[in-house]
Amino acid sequence: MTSTNLEGTFPLIARGKVRDIYQVDDNTLLFVATDRISAYDVIMANGIPNKGKILTKLSEFWFAFLPIDNHLIKGDIFEKYPQLEKYRDQLEGRSLLVRKLKLIPLEVIVRGYITGSGWKEYTKSKTVHGIPIGDVVESQQITPIFTPSTKAEQGEHDENITKEQADKIVGKELCDRIEKIAIDLYTKARDYAATKGIIIADTKFEFGLDGDKIVLVDEVLTPDSSRFWSAAKYKLGQSQESYDKQFLRDWLTANGVAGKDGVAMPEDIAVQTKQKYVEAYENLTGEKWQD
């Protein structure tokens, strides 16, 4: 399911790369994770079956696991809003009722391993995103670093920025708090995932404000927002076996269509990408996935 239509029951206020967002009331939003998938900032023409449900369940797992206030409103949406019952086939298993908060306008990225272009930069200058990194000998693992980016509008590209630039966008005091919280959350998740045979190479968090309290929002530590690697098959300085959409990125690159609009994935690529997401869910939660 790549789009939703609640026929005006609640107004659709945003349609992102993956989520359709409806306004329930002045203080409440309904997030619906569709099966859309994007790579290189472009949405594919077709989706990954039940991907939105996997993202939703995994986000719920991490919201419960991580020691920070989040935007979730607990309870059955169909009991709270009986008018949604007729849209159960669109909403069940892929919807989150959340508090409407003031969003912090940063993509909060934490990197614990040197990946991709970062590895190329490191081998030249021993820096990652301009941040000095010491010697990395036996692995690409580093002390986690905060590498923010801008939050681009739909169809635009996020832009990597420095901590100092982020300070100017949100204020240094708030940015310092965000950096510490994000690195602490990443570290807790990284250490847990390591016990499940998964390396979290990097991840993207998003935060909102409830007064001056920083609140975790959006999706959390999913294959869409993170790089998950197999610890057992890890190889220094090489392309890693991953449980995320790197598989799709690799296919797009190999076929010369990375970043092009309107590209449809062959069925086998969609199936194999879904399997990566299922493996991430099962390994991290210890639960068997059921469509």
UniProtKB/Swiss-Prot annotation:
Enzyme class: ligase
Signal peptide start-end: none
Family note: Belongs to the SAICAR synthetase family.
Pathway(s) where this gene product acts: Purine metabolism; IMP biosynthesis via de novo pathway; 5-amino-1-(5-phospho-D-ribosyl)imidazole-4-carboxamide from 5-amino-1-(5-phospho-D-ribosyl)imidazole-4-carboxylate: step 1/2
Superkingdom field: Eukaryota
Protein's name according to its UniProt entry: Phosphoribosylaminoimidazole-succinocarboxamide synthase
Annotated S-S bridges: none
Any one GO biological process: 'de novo' IMP biosynthetic process
PROSITE patterns tied to this protein: SAICAR_SYNTHETASE_1 (PS01057), SAICAR_SYNTHETASE_2 (PS01058)
GO molecular function: ATP binding; phosphoribosylaminoimidazolesuccinocarboxamide synthase activity
SUPFAM superfamilies: SAICAR synthase-like (SSF56104)
Keywords: ATP-binding, Ligase, Nucleotide-binding, Purine biosynthesis
Enzyme Commission numbers on file: 6.3.2.6
GO cellular component terms, semicolon-separated: cytoplasm
Catalysis performed (reactions): 5-amino-1-(5-phospho-D-ribosyl)imidazole-4-carboxylate + L-aspartate + ATP = (2S)-2-[5-amino-1-(5-phospho-beta-D-ribosyl)imidazole-4-carboxamido]succinate + ADP + phosphate + 2 H(+)
Keyword ATP-binding: yes
